């Protein structure tokens, strides 16, 4: 039986050795798998961090571009407000001229605008009170000197304009208010005004 025991012992030893070798091989393979997984995880982590950094840079660029755009918009808006104010002040200055000077400007504008000489002049309520009694008569004289039949009349009607006048011929009204003239001329002169202001 000693021979059987030896065989048994030998089989057990070989089985143990085989098991240990298998365990060792499995542990080595597991260690390799873990190492590769760790390397892969580190690489993915680096990729994710790099991507996050790039996204942060992109977000920063976008935010900067948006801030610059907003600053340009505000600057443009401020410029526009200054330009608007300049044009509004022009209207205010015209309206605040001394009555005689104001009347002369309006008179000249009317003479230059009249075509038939029989139009009606519509003023603002304020200007209607402001003009002298001989205002229309003076305009008609100037028209006659230009060879135009001077039969201009001051309308009973008034319009809500800050200054200037409305020239009415039948059903047609031509707006010669300061606001309308400035609005029409603004495009032509705005670039020069901006250049002068800035």
Swiss-Prot record:
Gene3D superfamilies assigned to the protein according to its UniProt record, in alphabetical order: ATP synthase, E subunit, C-terminal, F1F0 ATP synthase subunit B, membrane domain
Record's keyword annotation contains Magnesium: no
InterPro entries cross-referenced by the UniProt entry: ATPase_E_C, ATPase_V1_Esu
Protein keywords: ATP synthesis, Hydrogen ion transport, Ion transport, Transport
UniProt family annotation: Belongs to the V-ATPase E subunit family.
Cellular component terms per the entry's GO annotation: proton-transporting two-sector ATPase complex, catalytic domain
Naturally occurring in which organism (per UniProt): Acetivibrio thermocellus (strain ATCC 27405 / DSM 1237 / JCM 9322 / NBRC 103400 / NCIMB 10682 / NRRL B-4536 / VPI 7372)
Official protein name in the record: V-type ATP synthase subunit E
Functional description taken from the UniProt entry: Produces ATP from ADP in the presence of a proton gradient across the membrane.
MF terms (GO), sorted A to Z: ATP binding; proton-transporting ATP synthase activity, rotational mechanism; proton-transporting ATPase activity, rotational mechanism
